[in-house]
Amino acid sequence: MDLINELHQRNLIFHITNENKLKELIKNKYISLYCGFDPTEDSLHVGHLLPLITLKRFQVLGHKPIVLIGGATSLIGDPSFKTKERLLKSDSFVEKCTLKISQQISFFLDFNSNFNSAIILNNNLWFKKINILQFLRDVGKYFSVNALINREAVKKRIKRSDQGISFTEFSYNLLQAYDFFILNQKNQVSLQIGGSDQWGNISSGMHLIHRISKKEAYGLTLPLLMQSNGIKFGKTESGTVWLDPQKTTPYRFYQFWMNIEDSNVYRFLKLFTFIDIHEINEREKNSYKKNQIVSDKVLLAKHMTRLVHGDEKLSAAERITNILFFKNINDIQISDLEQLRKDGVPVVETYKIKDLQEALVLSSLAQSRTQAKNMIISNSISINTKKIVNKNYIIDDNDKLFNQFTLLSRGKKNHCLIYWNK
């Protein structure tokens, strides 16, 4: 199967230019392709995984992936389908973010291959060398303002009475077009990939290459993933799901995939994993069987957590899951409890709680001591996964894991971690 056909079967293609020519090109030679990432935050998030994994799919088959960090363009901000002007970032902030996301990207691609090693570039390399008059003369003259303002992303902003679009953001399209042109000239890049919201920017790059160099370049966009509630993929009630384990713990990351809607399980297995497409289709055919979807969610969560955080962090996420959902606390490690303390479950810090009823109220697992007493009597409360039925139970040192933590649970899904201050 050729790569473009596989991308179609995995539902990875939203737009593609000159598909037959691109198929022929990558069939007959190895190409260089790129995707850009603006360092507007100090971590990538799960929404960035799709383009990174797609770059990897090309690299596995011999093509050379280039990651372009928008050290210059991030100072402007991409207006594509944004409802309002982005806040401008400082140079120092962008530099810090560039370093961090470059380190994250290094885990996804092979930078030590014989002939198609991935490389990371920063568009500061060329934008710091070009002045505004040169840019307007050499780039701006190839673009019609009429065409630019008719781009869907720009039109939406112009039509809003409360939010227009500044010339700063309006110029972003030309800056990204120039990126593609430079990479085509210097690195023989013939394909740019990105989210479907990047179609206008990619098209401008192809246009500029054709006008100046008389060469044909190609574009491929990936679907923007939305949840059924209309919220962008990767956003939860508790915020963005980051790739940085200091911002989203591996356990919380693992649970994000476990909690996706059933209707997305096989779609995401196709989009995000390298599991054979035929195996995924077979799994989907059997999804009516008892526990099959849950089993396949586990497969997805394992694959993604291993990909982003590695085997050790995956094991920790599985241990924590076993504690909270399957009451298996035997293999718990203090680092697992530190993960839970960071963003796994609600946390109460104290040094003086004595009785269980007070602990349940303080942890918000109960609204009152009376309710707490009734919960204990009805066999709903556990300490460190052990059921407690004594309504007058006093918490002591034996209930402290590693002399620092106590896990309170109400039923199967409501937990709170007590952290004992010394």
From Swiss-Prot:
Q: Which domain of life is it from?
A: Bacteria
Kindly give the Gene3D superfamilies that the UniProt entry links to this protein: HUPs, RNA-binding S4 domain, Tyrosyl-Transfer RNA Synthetase
Keyword hit for Aminoacyl-tRNA synthetase: yes
Domain S4 RNA-binding positions: 354-412
Question: Do the record's keywords include Methyltransferase?
Answer: no
Catalysis: reaction(s): tRNA(Tyr) + L-tyrosine + ATP = L-tyrosyl-tRNA(Tyr) + AMP + diphosphate + H(+)
| Residues the entry annotates as binding ATP | K235
Q: A Pfam family name for this chain? A: SYY_C-terminal
Oligomer status and interactors: Homodimer.
Q: What is this protein called?
A: Tyrosine--tRNA ligase
- Name its species: Buchnera aphidicola subsp. Schizaphis graminum (strain Sg)
